[in-house]
A protein has these predicted regions:
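Transmembrane alpha-helical segments of polytopic membrane transport and secretion proteins
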Residues: 1-45, 288-304
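Hydrophobic alpha-helical transmembrane segments of membrane transport/permease proteins
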Residues: 2-14, 45, 49, 53-88, ...
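A short amphipathic helical element positioned immediately N-terminal to and/or at the very start
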Residues: 26-36, 82-85, 93, 210, ...
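Cleavable Sec-type N-terminal signal peptides
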Residues: 27, 45-56, 116, 120, ...
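Cytoplasmic juxtamembrane interface segments
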Residues: 28-46, 203-220
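Structural signature of transmembrane alpha-helix termini at the membrane-water interface
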Residues: 31, 52-63, 124, 179, ...
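Structured helix-beta-strand junction loops
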Residues: 36-37, 77, 192, 267
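Alpha-helical transmembrane segments of integral membrane proteins
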Residues: 87-304
């Protein structure tokens, strides 16, 4: 008796190019930036290079940032001093590298403080609403009614210039300002039906805030923090230029521009050129990176 062999199971050809992506959202953001945002990629590259130079400044230069040599005053660019020396023989390249370290330290520290304050104030104000929201927003309005740089100068004049003081002051000022942006996003999220559903199912205020509101506000916080870095770095340079920033002997880009002054501008223009170039590149890099992240993380702009 003949037997019938079972038919082989059908084969299904899968096109791996059409399979859904399983990358984490933050990895997907960087992949999309590489594909669609060339200026954002350039900004990210500038920021990465600046971070590496700041971290490995000790290994990249044989000189100390406060090391002087009066016999080599105003030496122009050469093999020993790639960016020349200043009025007391300090190596300009070394000071620019260490200036990047100070600027990034103040920038990241202030932005971390600002993000925490903005998140707490913005979400708290939006979630509770009513009188709480009214009082907090009127306090923010009163703060923003005064010129920001004037307030910072006044506070630092009382506290004294130091790395810690300028980081705290810049972080608090930026956090109060950015809390309004976070509040606006949190207000729109609070009105969604899933928030009402979570409350109806018995979720407490803490769970609703941490599980349902905070994750949806996080992309906005990332964008605000990235773009805020350029503002913080530029403000720190302005305060250092005025003598209210990080005190000597620590080098800052604003302090180097102040020391160059008109007295040495024509004799040794590199004293002002290289700190200005470094500051401009830092601001450009963080601005381009922040703009690209905003376009990729904001659902209203993802098509741009």
């Amino acid at each position: 008796m003949a037997t019938i062999a079972p038919a082989p199971p059908p084969t299904i050809a899968l096109d791996v190019r059409r399979l859904p992506r399983t990358l984490p959202w933050y990895v997907e953001v960087w992949v999309q930036m590489l594909r669609r945002k060339p200026l954002g990629t350039v900004g990210a590259a500038i920021v990465l290079v600046m971070l590496l130079l700041a971290v490995f400044a000790d290994a990249l230069t044989p000189y100390g940032f406060a090391e002087t040599n009066l016999r080599e005053r105003f030496v122009s660019m050469n093999g020993a001093h790639w960016l020349g020396t200043d009025q007391i023989g300090r190596d300009v390249a070394t000071r620019v590298l260490y200036g990047a370290r100070i600027s990034l330290y103040v920038g990241f520290g202030a932005v971390a403080i600002a993000s925490l304050i903005a998140t707490l104030l913005g979400i708290f104000s939006a979630y509770w609403g009513g009188r709480v929201d009214l009082l907090l927003q009127r306090a923010v309005d009163a703060w923003m009614a005064f010129p920001g740089l004037l307030i910072l100068m006044s506070i630092l004049s009382l506290l004294g210039p130091s790395v810690l003081n300028i980081t705290l002051v810049l972080g608090i000022a930026a956090g109060i300002r950015d809390s309004r942006i976070v509040r606006g996003v949190a207000l729109s999220i609070r009105e969604n039906t899933y928030i009402e559903g979570a409350r109806a199912m018995g979720s407490g205020h803490t769970r609703v805030t941490l599980v349902h509101i905070l994750p949806n506000v996080l992309p906005t916080i990332i964008v605000v923090a990235t773009t805020g870095l350029s503002t913080v770095i530029l403000t720190e340079a302005s305060l250092s230029f005025l003598g209210l920033g990080v005190p000597p002997p620590y080098p800052t880009w604003g302090g180097m521009l102040s020391l160059a002054g008109l007295d040495h501008m024509y004799r040794a223009p590199w004293l002002a050129i290289w700190p200005a170039v470094a500051l401009s590149l830092a601001v450009f890099g963080f601005n381009m990176l922040g703009d690209a992240l905003r376009d990729l993380l904001d659902p209203r702009l993802k098509g741009g």
